[in-house]
Regions:
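Copper-binding active sites and cupredoxin-like electron-transfer domains
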Residues: 1-134
C-alpha cells in the first residue's frame, strides 16, 4: 500500500472537500475511441439519476463511451447519496462522513498504470487553504 505521507501525493488530481460536503463529480469521456469506461469512487454511492428520488443507488457507473457524461451527486466521505430535501432544491447530507482519501478510477483496471485514477481527500478539521462551503 502506498502512503502520501511517505511518497507524496500522486501526480494525478487530488480533489479536496470537508466531510459531509454536498459534492458533484462531473464525469465525461472525451475520447474518440469506441472503448467503454466505468467510473468508480470508493466509499461512496450516488443516485443513477441524481434528481430522481426513485432511481437506483449505485457505486459505479458504466457505459461511458465517446462524448458521454453524467453527474455523481455525493456527500463527501459518506456512503449515503446526496439528497435534495422536501423542496427538491436544497442539497442535504447526513452527518456520517469519514475523513480520508477516497480513490476514484476507471474500473477497467488495465488503465490504472496509465494514470486513470486520482484521490478525493476528505478533511474533518479546518484547513487554512480550503474554504468551507457556505
Amino acid at each position: 500500500m502506498f502512503s502520501s505521507a511517505v511518497v507524496g501525493d500522486p501526480a494525478t488530481p487530488v480533489f479536496r472537500a470537508y466531510k459531509n460536503d454536498p459534492t458533484y463529480v462531473r464525469v465525461l469521456n472525451s475520447s474518440d475511441l469506441g472503448r467503454v469506461h466505468t467510473f468508480g469512487l470508493t466509499g461512496h454511492t450516488w443516485k443513477y439519476e441524481f434528481n430522481d428520488p426513485n432511481t437506483s443507488i449505485i457505486n459505479g457507473q458504466g457505459g461511458l463511451n465517446t462524448s458521454r457524461a453524467f453527474n455523481a451527486a455525493i456527500c463527501a466521505g459518506s456512503n449515503t447519496p446526496l439528497s435534495f430535501g422536501a423542496s427538491g432544491l436544497t442539497p442535504t447530507c447526513p452527518s456520517d462522513g469519514i475523513a480520508g482519501d477516497y480513490l476514484y478510477n476507471d474500473r477497467n483496471l488495465f488503465l490504472l498504470p496509465s494514470g486513470s485514477w486520482g484521490l478525493i481527500r476528505v478533511h474533518d478539521a479546518p484547513m487554512a487553504d480550503l474554504k468551507p462551503l457556505p
